[in-house]
Regions:
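Short intrinsically disordered, low-complexity segments
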Residues: 7, 11, 54-56, 62, ...
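Extended intrinsically disordered, low-complexity coil regions enriched in Ser, Thr, Gly, Ala
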Residues: 73-105, 135-149
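Short Lys/Arg-rich cationic patches that frequently serve as NLS/NoLS or arginine-rich RNA/DNA-binding motifs
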Residues: 2-38
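Short terminal alpha-helical segments
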Residues: 25-86
Length: 169
């Protein structure tokens, strides 16, 4: 059990043995497109997406960070959480809330010039989520990533509150 009594949702595939009856052959075979969606991103795409996260994070550790860039990191935290909800990740839910709070504090400190700088303490809270995001980009199937992006899009259009479970905050 994780902190605050909330464990990440893990998907397990249950294999049921079927006899060689008519039932075993009644299910259609997966199409090529569904097999494609069950595979991870190609290495080039995953690398480009991970690099974008890391460059944004690096910029925000120096004086090149802006509220817009930190907001992109908040989106990365939420997206990583949603991919974990699809069954691909094992980060303690409280770590997501810690990273979210650290990034929000960074935005609140921004002055009129909107320059944001992530402190070393905040960096330590965001790094585990960044590592989890990297792992997900290289290992999670496309379908899980697409579903997570859809959830993120719905959240961004309909809510101003955190998508993280209240018990984690």
């Amino acid at each position: 059990m994780f902190a605050f009594g909330f464990a990440p949702i893990l998907r397990c595939t249950n294999f049921v043995s079927m006899s060689r009856s008519k039932k075993a052959h009644s299910a259609p075979l997966p199409s090529a497109s569904s097999r494609f969606m069950q595979r991870p991103l190609d290495e080039k795409t995953a690398t480009e997406m991970a690099l974008a996260h890391h460059l944004t994070f690096a910029a925000c550790q120096g004086w090149a960070g802006t509220t817009r860039l930190v907001s992109e990191l908040v989106r990365m935290v939420y997206l990583t959480f949603y991919v974990q909800c699809e069954g691909y990740g094992d980060t303690d839910i409280a770590r997501f809330a810690d990273a979210e709070t650290a990034l929000e504090n960074c935005i609140l400190r921004a002055g009129d010039d909107e320059v944001c700088r992530i402190s070393p303490g905040e960096r330590a809270l965001v790094e585990p989520i960044l590592r989890q995001a990297d792992t997900q980009l290289f290992l999670a199937p496309r379908l899980a990533l697409i579903e997570a992006y859809k959830r993120l899009d719905r959240f961004l259009r309909n809510s101003n509150e955190s998508p993280l479970p209240q018990t984690a905050i």
